[in-house]
Amino acid sequence: MVDIIFSSSFLDDMGDHSKKKSGLAMCVGCGSQIHDQYILRVSPDLEWHAACLKCVECNQYLDETCTCFVRDGKTYCKRDYVRLFGIKCAKCTLGFSSSDLVMRARDSVYHIECFRCSVCSRQLLPGDEFSVRDEELLCRADHGLALERGPGGSPLSPGNIHTRGLHMAADPVSVRQTPHRNHVHKQSEKTTRVRTVLNEKQLHTLRTCYNANPRPDALMKEQLVEMTGLSPRVIRVWFQNKRCKDKKRSILMKQLQQQHGDKTNLQGMTGTALVAGSPIRHNPSVPGHPVDVQAYQPPWKALSEFALQSDLDQPAFQQLVSFSESGSLGNSSGSDVTSLSSQLPDTPNSMVPSPVET
């Protein structure tokens, strides 16, 4: 950052003694005293003549309108500083913008599109295993072929492979998060963790314990270490991943059930689930009287018994019974009913049907 301040000698000429600075302003570029009207100051305390502050590569004058970089006592503009000292892609040797995402392998930085196998040109994605040979990337398949062709003395012999072990590609990071090369090299010296593959017996043991207790205590984990032969970290991570997967699966099932319940539409009509309410008690305040039913006798039973005991005209009686059974009495004409009733004798009061005691 370049700041512009007034020179002390210029302030003396203006008669402003209150703003006079103690000491003399010396130019860092030429080493002489600054008597100009303006002084260009580069943070924190470097002062320059306006004519001395320029890029050592392109001789562009640097002022408050541009960014100034100082390295080893030399000043650079932003373009030349990035070109000379900025982080470059190990594949295409081009620089990075502030918004680029990069991939790292040991002390090298790559564009995402440049992070490819040098043999088959397959792009290496996060999670893929790779190796580094002479600052070049090899995928897992080509790394195995290089090891197999080693005894033949080919250029891809194990002696030329600096890293026999496979690394796992990490997620891309912002170029702003990429540290200096020396710092990157220190981080890359750490052992890269490789995914552990479990066999059927180990999986069965872990699943059985998970079904019994999804959150085992320290004692149970120690027993699992002895039973499976896995490290405590692998067992802890497996249980964490298992709980996370089950939680996601349960949330997904609830969403599917909710969506299935919302789709209860039939020919444009939406079905609504009805839920039966709780039973309520009988309200004794409702008026009512109990009825004692001792026996029930069909209405035509007494008439049939009377017909068997009396001398009635059988055809007329059968016609009357058929009317009562078929329910067609209401559809008959009034003359028929009158003719049938005229043929029946008068029934004495003593013959009125009464309930039969049982």
Swiss-Prot record:
Cellular compartment(s): Nucleus
Low complexity bias (residue ranges): 325-335
PROSITE patterns in the record: HOMEOBOX_1, HOMEOBOX_2, LIM_DOMAIN_1, LIM_DOMAIN_2
Pfam family membership, one: LIM
GO MF term list: cis-regulatory region sequence-specific DNA binding; DNA-binding transcription factor activity, RNA polymerase II-specific; metal ion binding
Cysteine pairs bridged by disulfides in the record: none
Listed Polar residues bias regions: 336-358
Protein function: Binds to one of the cis-acting domain of the insulin gene enhancer. May be involved in the regional specification of the myotome and also in target recognition by the caudal primary neuron.
Protein name according to UniProt: Insulin gene enhancer protein isl-2b
Species this protein is from: Danio rerio (Zebrafish)
Gene: isl2b
